[in-house]
Swiss-Prot record:
EC number: 6.1.1.6
This protein's name: Lysine--tRNA ligase
Record carries keyword Nucleotide-binding: yes
Annotated family: Belongs to the class-II aminoacyl-tRNA synthetase family.
Enzyme kind, highest EC tier: ligase
Lineage, highest ranks first: Bacteria, Pseudomonadati, Pseudomonadota, Betaproteobacteria, Burkholderiales
Length: 520
């Protein structure tokens, strides 16, 4: 068995031709009738419709690993007693002997059920059970004539009656939105989904272990904020009845984490949800998981070094290699991550030439792309801001290999420290892989008076109609007035990192229950 957290995700076998459609409503009615009979039997003191006293002593994967290679004679001689439980996924009834396959959280294992072993009445009951029912079985291990490890059942119980039929075993859930909406069915029927989300959990655990191993303290900060802050984004609003005040779901934990740096914790991190009331796409979900971390006495170059090591380490622990494949194209984490300023990236990946330093040229180029004066206020923007817009429209998607993009304009980076030599830009970077932003970090602004002035500029922008501009956070400024050491901070999108590690095309594929329009 592989030591890596994310095993190779199996490729589903080609499906045979579809079987004739069966009316689900009819099947549900038949199953409800069976449950009705079970309840009636319970009322007469004959069993329990939903028993909860069966305790499986073994998992399918562990049994297969321990005994899968044993030969039939050895297993028979050992008479290994086992008890398993799971969902019945396959069933073949053949007179006095039948086979069923049950699936637990780890794998599947076959049951060999005979009338002689469990009794005529129990065998008759078993034949009435349906796929999807959850069963418990006791018996001994055996090998079939084809060499498949199986449980020769001596006791068999129905633990939960399934009222809804599972999708066709070969075709599964064909509708992608239905997979997202009914993730519980997707997990039952699609092994790749179970592998993917198990991998996500283990990779996040490895990430947490990495941070703690580097001296970071894990903390929890509020999800409900009296003032939204920490990022330029549109927040979700709610109302706190007891306090009788408007509150906001957090768009980022940044300002609270930096308060902790002021308080004397020199290295902190948080892995948690953030919320942004914005668009939904293959890269964006309004509720998403992010890790933010802050280290006193670090600057943005220290952060880039650390982030590079972090990404490589998690890839090693998760998939056992730093040479990945994403949607058929290689992603090489073994090479040093390229570091370019926004201007350098434009010159490298476009034919802008001297136009990169010409506001009029950039405005004209952006208009040709489809941006407008009315919506985007191009003529009101600085050269640095126009360069960012041109970068986002023409360069971003070309950054397939890991690349740090540096020196974002001060006007759009209200929490970042300005560059001492070029105060119009900041000591900030964004990490791009596969044409997508994976992280954002910078040397933190720790000048309280400068921060107050930046907040005032954000308030003016909000008054001019910028919904994503920040509010003025008086308490955060007050915290900075006590003095915050030089600090570096970074946020990494966990969902996008999981997309990369599991080769998933959409962010919805790595979020168990993504945001969807209400079902009609």
């Amino acid at each position: 068995m592989s030591d890596h957290l994310i095993p190779s995700i199996p490729t589903p076998a080609a499906a045979p031709a579809a079987a004739p459609a069966v009316d689900d409503n009819q099947l549900i009615a038949e199953r409800r009738e069976k449950l009705k009979l079970m309840r009636a039997a319970q009322a007469e003191g004959k069993g329990v419709a939903f028993p909860n006293d069966f305790k499986p002593g073994h998992r399918a994967a562990a049994l297969i690993e321990a005994h899968g290679a044993a030969d039939a004679e050895a297993l028979e001689a050992q008479a290994v007693a086992v008890s398993v439980a799971g969902r019945m996924m396959l069933k073949r009834v053949m007179g006095k002997a039948s086979f069923a396959t049950v699936q637990d959280a780890t794998s599947r294992i076959q049951l060999y059920v005979t009338r002689d072993a469990i009794g005529e009445e129990a065998y008759a009951e078993f034949k009435r059970w349906d796929l999807g029912d959850i069963v418990g079985a006791e018996g001994t291990l055996m090998k079939t004539k084809t060499g498949e490890l199986s449980v020769k059942v001596t006791k068999l119980r129905l633990l939960t009656k399934s009222l809804r039929p599972l999708p066709d075993k070969f075709h599964g859930m064909a509708d992608q939105e239905q997979k997202y909406r009914q993730r519980y069915v997707d997990l039952i029927t699609d092994e790749t989904a179970r592998v993917r989300f198990t991998a996500r959990s283990k990779a996040v655990s490895a990430l947490r272990e990495f941070m703690v191993g580097h001296g970071f303290l894990e903390v929890e900060t509020p999800m409900l904020h009296p003032i939204p802050g920490g990022a330029n984004a549109k927040p979700f609003k709610t109302h706190h009845n007891a306090l009788d005040q408007e509150m906001f779901l957090r768009i980022a934990p940044e300002l609270y984490l930096k308060r902790l740096i002021v308080g004397g914790f020199e290295r902190v991190f948080e892995i948690n949800r953030s919320y942004r009331n914005e668009g939904i796409s293959v890269r964006h979900n309004p509720e998403f998981t992010m890790m933010e971390f802050y280290a006193a006495y670090w600057n943005y170059r220290d952060l880039m070094d650390f982030t590079e090591t972090l990404i490589r380490t998690i890839a090693d622990k998760a998939v056992g290699t730093q040479q990945l494949t994403y949607q058929g194209k290689p992603v090489d984490l073994t090479q040093p991550f390229e570091r370019l300023t926004i201007r350098e990236a434009i010159l490298k990946y476009t034919e802008a030439g001297t136009g990169v330093d010409d506001s009029a040229w950039l405005i004209n180029a952006l208009r040709k792309i489809g941006l407008s004066e009315e919506k985007d206020k191009l003529s009101q923007r600085s050269l640095a801001s126009l360069q960012v817009m041109y970068f986002e429209e023409t360069v971003e998607e070309k950054l397939w290999q890991p690349t740090f993009i540096m020196e974002h304009p001060t006007e759009i980076s209200p929490l970042a420290r300005a560059n001492d030599e070029r105060p119009e830009v900041t000591e900030r970077f964004e990490l791009y892989i596969t044409g997508r932003e994976f992280g954002n970090g910078f040397s933190e602004l720790n000048d309280a008076e400068d921060q107050a002035a930046r907040f005032n500029a954000q308030v003016a922008a909000k008054d001019s109609g910028d919904d994503e501009a920040m509010f003025y956070d008086h308490d955060f400024v007050r915290a900075l007035e006590y003095g915050m050491p030089p600090t570096g901070g970074c946020g990494i999108g966990i969902d996008r990192l999981m997309m990369l590690l599991t080769d998933s095309p959409s962010i919805r594929d790595v979020i168990l229950f993504p945001a969807l329009r209400r079902e009609s």
